[in-house]
């Protein structure tokens, strides 16, 4: 009975109260930029995804209104497709099953739209909304903790919770997400790194230093990014048509298109 009770108590402990499982040392990667596109209007990027030949962006209302923007990957022209106004702080977004899902930060609302951007019944999120992506079957969300949530696209109910581990510790502040090539890529809030996570084990398999993106910016662009501590990297998307990833940040004037390679 005592053994059974001890096991039950361990199950009920919060993630941080138990020792993190062992994971291999992450591989160090570099992002090799193949081209960059300067956008003609800035956005406080909270979600990023390539869909139907364009880069789509969900923004928070840090400097105005929460929006869904469509960015031309050739010219950088930004078109606002949906506007949630100033009452909601837009967060992660993803296209899945002919629908667009957009989370909100602390309002617990998930906006859903059909393929023509017509509103569908909203869903409820019991947690804070941060990053959102999907695999072949489920939505995958983050809430700023060390956990990823695998969710039903029908009602946003939780099917599985995956703790994320790096270097023997749970990795907190997981933010924007992208599922690509069998892995989950994630920004880490207030950190200039990107991580690649195993969706099976939760282990961080690789890390990417993003500071070189800031260093290669034009002086005026770098001045914008350096002007506010909130303007951190946030936004990772994958284009299966070209095989390129797209990286950006909050209020960054530029989108970077490139590939990940082993660090020197």
Predicted features and spans:
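Beta-rich, blade/repeat-based domains predominating
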Residues: 41-52, 86-96, 125-142, 168-182, ...
């Amino acid at each position: 009975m005592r053994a059974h009770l001890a096991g039950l108590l361990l199950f009920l402990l919060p993630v941080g109260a138990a020792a993190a499982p062992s994971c291999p040392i992450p591989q160090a990667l570099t992002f090799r930029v193949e081209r960059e596109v300067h956008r003609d209007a800035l956005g406080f990027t909270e979600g990023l995804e390539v869909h139907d030949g364009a880069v789509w962006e969900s923004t928070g209302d840090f400097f105005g209104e929460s929006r869904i923007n469509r960015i031309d990957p050739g010219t950088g022209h930004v078109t606002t497709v949906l506007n949630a106004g100033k009452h909601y702080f837009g967060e992660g977004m993803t296209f899945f099953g002919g629908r667009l899902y957009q989370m909100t930060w602390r309002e617990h609302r998930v906006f859903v739209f059909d393929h023509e951007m017509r509103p569908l019944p909203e869903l409820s999120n019991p947690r804070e909304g941060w990053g959102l992506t999907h695999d072949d079957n489920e939505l995958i969300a983050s809430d700023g903790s060390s956990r990823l949530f695998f969710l039903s696209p029908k009602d946003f109910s939780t099917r599985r919770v995956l703790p994320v581990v790096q270097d023997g510790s749970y990795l907190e502040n997981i933010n924007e997400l992208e599922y690509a090539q069998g892995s989950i890529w994630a920004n880490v809030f207030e950190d200039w790194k990107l991580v690649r996570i195993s969706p099976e084990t939760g282990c961080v398999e690789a890390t990417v230093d993003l500071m070189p993106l800031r260093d290669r910016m034009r002086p005026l662009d770098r001045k914008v990014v350096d002007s506010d501590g909130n303007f951190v990297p946030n936004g990772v998307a994958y284009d299966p048509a070209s095989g390129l990833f797209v990286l950006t940040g909050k209020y960054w004037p530029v989108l970077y298109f490139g590939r990940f390679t082993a660090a020197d």
